[in-house]
From Swiss-Prot:
InterPro entries: AAA+_ATPase, MCM, MCM7, MCM_CS, MCM_dom, MCM_lid, MCM_N, MCM_OB. The keyword Nucleus applies. Early fractionation of eukaryotic MCM proteins yielded a variety of dimeric, trimeric and tetrameric complexes with unclear biological significance. Specifically a MCM467 subcomplex is shown to have in vitro helicase activity which is inhibited by the MCM2 subunit. The MCM2-7 hexamer is the proposed physiological active complex. Residues 332-538 form the MCM domain. This is DNA replication licensing factor MCM7.
Length: 719
């Protein structure tokens, strides 16, 4: 590769900044960087972002050179901008800061003491870092793909690259010294020391000509008002869980932020960072102990906070016609659900619920109050019913997920920990599992084994979707907009239907009510089911894959892409369904009161029905929730409640409408032998029965000669 002539490169840069333009809506030329240079000259703008896509239109070779040797070209661009600024300065700067006044005062004093026509002493020149009052950053070309953090190796040193990850730790913003200014106590001369490394050795002896000639040995004292500082922040980003090979620890990289790039991201944010990959330069005694190894960091130039759809690279792009044909079948809902953990036999309704958890409902924010759209599910059951297998599959399937166990998780491990920063010694926040799973799924196994003090940290996350921190003087709120999928075992080995739900699982009612679906998976002896399950397990062990089914399960990547497409939809509930949903909820409340239900049916149940309905509408890629979606949501809710009742409760819930109507009318005639027909009909309809069911019950018990109805049908009399 031929050596670059940087004088020619400098002319190219100058020409680009002066001449690059685009045509606006009126067809007039708009000089993009010329306008920004005017703002920089007048101090109306601090940072100049150079888009490499703009350079690629005229000179693709220059873009390659910048990407290969970004640090050198960053200084080159800075020098060119500094030279051009006086040409673009149209007026004097009104708002001057301390450094402006300091430099102007020094120049004025020096001019007074200098003879007329004399040339300024080059030793008194101010360093370019002190005079430069702007920041220059590159924005990477759109053609370059983001790298995985573990693929950033030694061959990337000095190059401009883009990495994606999740922010795990952010330090406080502090001032970093760029130029140190000293004053001599003997001759009064000023000395400037540009600082390039993280640490520096302050100057002690005055290097001026006067002190050296007189041998006065003047000592230098640091002038903080004349020194230049920039905002400095350090951030750690960790690679996403789907980028980590099985059995490996997630890699992380240190990102250094300066100036206008600070205070952009918080722990838990998913970011895309474009920057220069550099080694840490040690000086002084640290250089002697450094050895052959060097720490590295990314000098950030461009930071973008990403949404979930931006983050899922595989979700980008439309589905092909073949892929759409695979999904667009009549039973696509069943097919998608059965494609979740196909090696696990049965659990069809549980898999449907897990599919809806991945799709999620729609967030609502009426007048500032946030109603979550994420669906929470708790799987309970006897040991050996594949709860943990379902959790681990969802962890692999979800684009963003965190997997943890209750016994090995502390409260700070789930929410956020306050750690002391190794660089500055300051206290910093490091996000836990729930923060890192923001806009994803957090799978918590052995939920019942968690300590009570640690479990209380989840209450706020499940409803408010935030984590409030008040530790060691740090008061802040972090986002934790994640769905929680928990698995718990019964307290006494197996689920006892004679005990209440709280006694079986030993979880507080306040926490259980926050779950949209509580699913009990019991291991009941059944010859046919046991035979099919045993055949399924032996086949999986023999062939290391699931048995041949009636259909081919969908590929995991295809499911991820389809779920990402579903997230783009924002379905709404039409007014025509409002009364239907309300009546269904009232009926569920009535049934829960009549049958002494194991779970508490509250207003959260109604919100759960709405969330499940909107998730089903999203799954069908429509913008309006239909009655079938509501019915399926209610069916899943009923199935989850039925699973909690056990064999004893199954008969109680499946009581015939005629028998319930008979019991209702018998309550009305507790004082006498007859009751008004209209009163009985009104009472039964208010309890959710239809007039047809009421009439059928009347006819049935009249045939049995239990009661008689008079000819005018105004009175019911017991025989």
């Amino acid at each position: 590769m031929a050596l670059k002539d940087y004088a020619i490169e400098k002319e190219k840069v100058k020409k680009f900044l002066q001449e690059f333009y685009y045509e606006n809506e009126l067809g007039k030329k708009q000089f993009k960087y010329g306008t920004q240079l005017v703002h920089l000259a007048h101090r109306e703008q601090v940072a100049l972002y150079v888009d490499l896509d703009d350079i690629a239109e005229d000179d693709p070779e220059l873009v390659d050179s910048i990407c290969e040797n970004a640090k050198r070209y960053s200084r080159l661009f800075g020098d060119v901008v500094q030279e051009l600024l006086p040409e673009y300065k149209e007026k004097e700067v009104v708002n001057k800061d301390v450094l402006d006044v300091y430099i102007e005062h020094r120049l004025m004093m020096e001019q007074r003491s200098r003879d007329p026509g004399a040339v300024r002493n080059p030793q008194n020149q101010y360093p370019s870092e002190l005079m430069r009052r702007f920041e220059l950053y590159f924005r990477g070309p759109s053609s370059s793909k983001p790298r995985v953090i573990r693929e950033v190796r030694a061959d990337s040193v000095g190059k401009l690259l883009t990495v994606r990850g999740i922010v795990t730790r952010v330090s406080e913003v502090k001032p970093r010294m760029v130029v140190a200014t000293y004053t001599c106590d003997q001759c009064g001369a000023e000395t400037y020391q540009p600082i390039q490394s993280p640490t520096f050795m302050p100057l002690i002896m005055c290097p001026s000509q006067e002190c050296q000639t007189n041998r006065s040995g003047g000592r230098l004292y640091l002038q903080t008002r004349g020194s230049k500082f920039v905002k400095f922040q350090e951030m750690k980003i960790q690679e996403h869980s789907d980028q980590v090979p099985v059995g490996n620890i997630p890699r992380s990289i240190t990102v250094v932020l300066e100036g206008e790039n600070t205070r952009i991201a918080q722990p838990g944010d998913h970011v895309s960072v474009t920057g220069i990959f550099l080694p840490v330069l040690r000086t002084g005694f640290q250089q002697m102990a450094q050895g052959l190894l060097s720490e590295t960091y990314l000098e950030a130039h461009w930071i973008v906070k990403m949404t979930k759809s931006d983050d899922d690279v595989s979700g980008a792009g439309e589905l092909s016609s073949e892929e759409l044909k695979q999904i667009a079948e009549e039973d696509f809902y069943e097919k998608l659900a059965a494609s979740i953990a196909p090696e696990i036999y049965g659990h069809e309704d549980v898999k449907k619920a897990l599919l809806l958890l991945l799709v999620g409902g729609v967030d609502q924010s009426p007048q500032g109050m946030k109603i979550r759209g994420n669906i929470h599910i708790c799987l309970m059951g006897d040991p050996g019913v594949a709860k943990s297998q379902l959790l681990s599959y969802i962890d692999r399937l979800a684009p963003r997920s965190q997997y943890t166990t209750g016994r090995g998780s502390s409260g700070v491990g789930l929410t956020a920990a306050v750690l002391r920063d190794s660089v500055s010694g300051e206290l910093t926040l490091e996000g836990g599992a729930l923060v890192l799973a923001d806009q994803g799924v957090c799978c918590i196994d052995e939920f019942d084994k968690m300590a009570e003090a640690d479990r209380t940290a989840i209450h706020e996350v499940m409803e408010q979707q935030t984590i409030s921190i008040a530790k060691a003087g740090i008061l802040t709120t972090l986002n934790a907009r994640c769905s929680i999928l928990a698995a718990a075992n019964p307290a006494y080995g197996r689920y006892n239907p004679r005990r209440s739900l709280e006694q079986n699982v030993q979880l507080p009612a306040a926490l259980l009510s926050r779950f949209d679906l509580l699913w009990l998976i019991q291991d009941r002896p059944d010859r046919d089911n046991d035979l099919r399950l045993a055949q399924h397990i032996t086949y999986v062990h023999q062939h290391s894959r699931q048995p041949p089914a009636q259909f081919e399960p969908l590929d995991m990547k295809l499911m991820r892409r389809y779920i990402a497409m579903c997230h783009e939809r924002q379905p709404t509930v039409p007014e025509s369904l409002a009364d239907y949903i309300t009546a269904a909820y009232v009926e569920m409340r009535r049934e829960a009161r009549a049958s002494k239900d194991a779970t508490y049916t509250s207003a959260r149940t109604l919100l759960a029905i709405l969330r499940l309905s909107t998730a089903l509408a999203r799954l069908r890629m429509v913008d309006i929730v239909e009655k079938e979606d509501v019915n399926e949501a209610i069916r899943l809710m009923e199935m989850s409640k039925d699973s909690l009742l056990g064999e004893k409760g199954q008969t109680a819930r499946t009581q015939r409408p005629a028998d319930v109507i008979f019991a209702t009318i018998r309550e009305l005639v507790s004082r006498g032998r007859s009751v008004h027909f209209s009163e009985a009909e009104q009472r039964c309809i208010s309890r959710g029965f239809t007039p047809a069911q009421f009439q059928a019950a009347l006819d049935e018990y009249e045939e049995l000669n239990v009661w008689q109805v008079n000819t005018s049908r105004t009175r019911i009399t017991f025989v």
